[in-house]
């Protein structure tokens, strides 16, 4: 299940050049679990674009931010300025519902 519909207090933190997603996720039994997931394990930077299945996007990003409920659909959007091969930075975003889900109170990649 997309994590955002079963999450509370979703946020990111950048620590030691890694971007970590945190939230309280509802388990199948209805209880809540404090969960975290290192987004650099599943998101990379491919010439200034987010790349699913890549790694370490934080190393070539600046101004990383997260909006847990953006727009009318209240989607969790990760935004950053990503460096391309020429050293230029570009504003990019990715909808985390497309790549991260809640499996019984734990974050899991969809691929």
Curated annotation (Swiss-Prot):
GO terms for molecular function: carbohydrate binding. Disulfide bonds: none annotated. Mannose-binding lectin. Keywords: Lectin. Signal peptide: none annotated. Belongs to the cyanovirin-N family. This is Cyanovirin-N homolog. It holds the Pfam family CVNH. The lineage of its organism: Eukaryota, Fungi, Dikarya, Ascomycota, Pezizomycotina. PANTHER family: CYANOVIRIN-N DOMAIN-CONTAINING PROTEIN, CYANOVIRIN-N HOMOLOG.
């Amino acid at each position: 299940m997309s994590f955002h519909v079963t999450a509370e207090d979703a946020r990111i933190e950048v620590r030691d050049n890694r971007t970590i997603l945190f939230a309280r996720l509802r388990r199948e039994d209805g209880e809540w679990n404090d969960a975290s997931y290192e987004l650099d394990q599943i998101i990379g930077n491919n010439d200034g674009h987010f790349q699913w299945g890549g790694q370490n996007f934080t190393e070539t990003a600046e101004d990383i931010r997260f909006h847990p409920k953006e727009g009318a659909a209240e989607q969790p959007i990760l935004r950053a300025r990503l460096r391309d091969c020429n050293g230029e930075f570009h504003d990019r975003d990715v909808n985390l519902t497309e790549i991260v889900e809640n499996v019984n109170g734990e974050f899991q990649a969809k691929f």
